[in-house]
Curated annotation (Swiss-Prot):
ADP binds at residues 150-157. The lineage of its organism: Bacteria, Pseudomonadati, Pseudomonadota, Alphaproteobacteria, Rickettsiales. NCBIfam families: PRK05339.1. Belongs to the pyruvate, phosphate/water dikinase regulatory protein family. PDRP subfamily. It comes from Neorickettsia sennetsu (strain ATCC VR-367 / Miyayama) (Ehrlichia sennetsu). Keywords: Kinase, Nucleotide-binding, Serine/threonine-protein kinase, Transferase. Its EC number is 2.7.11.32, 2.7.4.27. This is Putative pyruvate, phosphate dikinase regulatory protein.
Length: 270
């Protein structure tokens, strides 16, 4: 049985890489013994160079990295050492077959095309959204493509999920009166931060419906008109102060909100 060291390198999570590696190696079941080495959050040349210390010549590298300079550095390192270095889903099974000298079991052209880079970019993006919903895990906001800020019930979460299906890593953060936003927001570069606002009457209507559904009547200020007016006013002031584009979501569908955000994203060329 052949031994194989598989290094999985990503600028975020490695779940997608693990999935495709295992699915590919199943074609060589009982023929190859593989050991996986996981290198998530490889977001800089410095981090990549630390990974290099662990890659031996008898290795197989799979990667998913968006930053061109990091990709090129990895490919150059592997090329000089004649180490196979494959972008995920660039004919992974075919490359494994060539490297190992073993014909894969029950493969077809269609199976090679089952997945593609966009699919796994979406998987990574969805994982990011789920772990960065409603202000969670603000420590790595610099990994996001887009950050959405807005009061409760302004469609932050569904819009984030929708954008993740397009392959964008999106975090959303609630704006709440008298609770400061993460200080990190003012230091981020090359990340689109957008503020969502809404007509106060519409927001009152939505929040009252929410309270009725949840039967949570212990928070009367949640749908109080004066509180909502103050919250929306303060939110808009914060957005303008930080030069964040403001998008009014009143009577807009999630698709329309996402389209407006993508327009800002494209205009600013992030």
């Amino acid at each position: 049985m052949k031994q194989l060291n598989v290094h999985l390198i990503s600028d975020y999570g490695v779940d997608a890489l693990i999935a495709v590696s295992r699915a590919s190696l199943e074609r060589f079941e009982h023929l190859v013994s593989a050991e996986h080495h996981l290198w998530p959050s490889t977001t800089s040349i410095e981090k990549l160079q630390q990974v290099f210390l662990h890659i031996e010549r008898s290795s197989f590298v799979l990667y998913s990295i968006r930053e061109r300079i990091i990709r090129d550095t990895l490919k150059d390192f592997c090329q000089k050492r004649k180490i196979p270095c494959i972008a995920v889903l660039s004919r992974v099974i075919r490359e494994l077959s060539s490297y190992l000298g073993i014909e894969p079991i029950h493969t077809s052209k269609e199976e090679y095309q089952t997945f593609n880079e966009d699919y796994f970019a979406r998987i990574d993006a969805m994982n990011y959204v789920l772990t960065h919903d409603d202000g969670q895990n603000t420590w790595d906001l610099d990994e996001a493509n887009i950050i959405i800020v807005g009061p409760s019930r302004t469609s932050k979460s569904p819009t984030s999920v929708y954008l993740s299906h397009l392959g964008y890593r999106v975090a959303n953060i609630p704006f709440v009166n008298n609770i400061p936003l993460p200080a990190k927001l003012t230091t981020l570069e090359n990340i689109l931060i957008v503020g969502l606002t809404i007509n106060p009457d519409r927001l009152i209507e939505i929040r009252k419906a929410r309270l009725s559904i949840s039967q949570n009547y212990d928070n009367p200020v949640y749908a109080d008109r004066e509180q909502i007016l103050e919250e929306l006013t303060n939110a808009r002031k914060t957005f303008i102060k930080n030069n964040w584009p403001v998008i009014d979501v009143t009577h807009r569908s999630v698709e329309e909100i996402a389209a407006a955000i993508m327009k800002e994203y494209t205009m600013r060329k992030y």
